[in-house]
Amino acid sequence: MKVTIFGTGYVGLVTGACLAEMGNHVICVDIDAAKVERLKRGEIPIYEPGLESIVLRNHASGRLDFTTEVAPAIAHGELLFIAVGTPPDEDGSADMKYVLAVAASIGQHLGGYTVVVNKSTVPVGTADRVREAVAAELLARDVAIEFDVVSNPEFLKEGAAVEDCLRPDRIIVGASSARAVAALRKLYAPFNRNHDRMVVMDERSAELTKYAANAMLATKISFMNEIANIAERVGADVELVRQGIGSDPRIGYHFIYPGAGYGGSCFPKDVQALERAAHSHGYEARLLGAVEAVNRQQKGKLFELISRHFDGQLKGRTIALWGLAFKPNTDDMREAPSRQLMEALWNAGAQVRAFDPEAREETHRLYGEREDLVLCDKPHEALHGADVLAVVTEWKAFRSPDFAHIRATLAEPAIFDGRNLYDPAVVEEAGLAYYGIGRGRSLRISN
């Protein structure tokens, strides 16, 4: 099929590349001419395992192209995907200007029946607004052209997005037109061979499904962080509690890992947007507010532990950080716990030596050259000249470190384990003080 995708960000680029991989002819549109030229040269703007190879392969084959030209891209597409950003507005609600701008462009150039497919994460009711925006432009042109609008939210995990796109566990299609559903079934047939993963519903339910999924996952994380904070105060070990409750099949082990808080481009924004949407309809979503509040508090946890270790005297101290991206297998630092930690350390007069396998360039882009920040090429280099070590992101490369080397290198041997990667007994046996999240005895928190 011929597909046009508006947006070459995370969702648009992954979706376009994966659709091309299945034999479709895809054009990705972006208003950033420099970005389009980089993509044409094979320069991928984000780190995502497996993405570069399928972009290069399909661009070389002619199945995937990039352009800034809107009119020919609209003429190309049997399906027109909207995959642009919906950043939080000043009040936390989703800013719809980019989505509606694309809808208006479609109405200005549409020449025949097509299906407009919204991939962006949007408030409930957006399909109606997109439909109205397209129709208004057609009316202004004094033409009558049929089109359908579908909500088809993405469920891509950063770090596993290509796999998620090629082998989806569900395909949500919100549509009120049988013709549109048939078009989506045809498009997704190669992804849907083993069993029918497509769940068809109305547009509003599909839009809410996306927000509800992310809010549920964020809720599980904040819940476990609450349990971890209780465990610290009662002398329990949250890791044992996690194993105990995870063995209940009604709960399971997914997303019940306590830590330094969640970040990224989705959970913080989507929980806040859903809460604001509820408020705009006269409902106070108190649970969502609590999820947000717990996460804000949890992002300050590592700084709290480090500050307590040094009796609040951080001026002149050097802290080694392992992990800068908000999660492993990405270079994304949006809302990353590492950012709040580094900024708090700097404000307290401390210096940071940091290592991340992929987020070095992004960190430099965000903070530039600073005397109080050294970005290192290897994990052990971050330890040189540091007083203590804080582990912020659970990259696999950090799972089995040489504790003896860490102890010998740090000035005050202590590990602040923001992801509970290590066994406290093993760390302490190696001669290091251990501070985890909710590990009871090792945190030495008094009531």
Model-derived features with residue positions:
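Structural/interface elements that position substrates and couple domains in central-metabolism enzymes
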Residues: 1-447
